[in-house]
Amino acid sequence: MNKLHQWKERLRDRARTVSFGRFLWRRFLDDRLFQAAASLAYTTVFALVPLAIVVFGVLSAFPAFNEWKDALTDFIFNNFVPGAARSVQNYLNRSLEDLGKFTVAGMVALVASLLITLHSIEQTFNSIWRVAAARPKVTRFLIYWTVLTLGTMLAAASMAMAAYVFALPLFRTTEGQWLAEFAWRLAPMAVEFVCIVLIYRVVPQHVVRLRHALPGALLAVILMEIVKWGFGFYLGNFQTYQRIYGALSALPILLLWIYLSWVSVLLGASLASSMSAFRYQPEAMRLPPGFEIYGLLRLLGRFSQARVHGDGLDEDRILALEPMLTDTLMQELLCELKRIRLLRRDERGQWLLARDLDVVPLAELYENCQLRVPIEDRPLPCRDDAFGQAAAAALEQLRQPLRSVLAQPVGDLYTHLPGDPP
């Protein structure tokens, strides 16, 4: 109840709501989701056959699930694929029947296309969540394999469990049959919702809270249902596409369907990442534009203090300690510090100093992080604490010599040039 009351109070706070709306819109634009969805749709089409091989190969390894292969295929194509594109199901079935005829080079190409698709998906989600560092390659492969195998087994087991439950005498009555029919109608949306929540939580190299993944998945499911309804309406009332494409009409329909599905999923992901990244900052707690170096120096001070105590800092802890940092700025700073090998990440996901700050000159930070040294004085958040005083003093030493140099007129630079034109 306290959490619910807290969310109600936040919604009543007009300034917070407007700030979040602007933040969300900027994230939508910055993520370039429509371009990312187009790229993923293209690679997904090429990964359909290898994905089917892996899925049905996993089911074939467990005789108990063999009888559910056809049922799982029919459930997917009947509920998630437009009717005009279901001829693809026959193509996939023929490909699986001819699996033994594939050469080694062909199998390598299929597996490579699947790995490329999965890698592209992970990169896209990492970009949406502003992840500073991707997973190691071995860890990435293990996650891919776990998602594919366990996801397939859970899907088949869920269908077997549902069939067993709906075969009970309770569901043979009129009321029970109505309830079973309602459950089967609701099942596709429930499957979509659960799968998208799991994708948001597992795929990005970022801790995604359930309270953020749920609204994002809900938005994605609503958009996918709207797309599904729109496809059904168009395909049921307009047959122009069949006259234009003829026997090939299934391919553009499938490609457009995959594209719009990815748009829905990525828009939901952008909402989830925005909810986790958004930090409402009162005016007094915002870093002035161009003063990112102040935040960087404070951040390094926090890591120096944590190192004394033998600790690391996770991203939530950093944002709690430094409320003037936005999630985007924090990720950018962490990425740059990792790139110059000043920070590293341990197996728990915490960030640690990788080098002694006593041997790191300020020039290295200035050159590599490419942050400006602001000349003007501006009110800085948390300037009176120990970290603020140290960072402000260093900043003052950096900009003091620049003030007199930059105060001279530009014309004075050319007073000693020869008078005759070249």
Curated annotation (Swiss-Prot):
It is a multi-pass membrane protein. It is found in: Cell inner membrane. Coiled coil: none annotated. The keyword Transmembrane helix applies. InterPro entries: UPF0761_bac, Virul_fac_BrkB. It holds the Pfam family Virul_fac_BrkB. The chain crosses the membrane at residues 45-65, 102-122, 151-171, 179-199, 213-233, 247-267. It comes from the Bacteria. Keywords: Cell inner membrane, Cell membrane, Membrane, Transmembrane, Transmembrane helix. GO terms for cellular component: plasma membrane. The keyword Magnesium does not apply. Belongs to the UPF0761 family. NCBIfam families: PRK04214.1, yihY_not_rbn. This is UPF0761 membrane protein XAC0937.
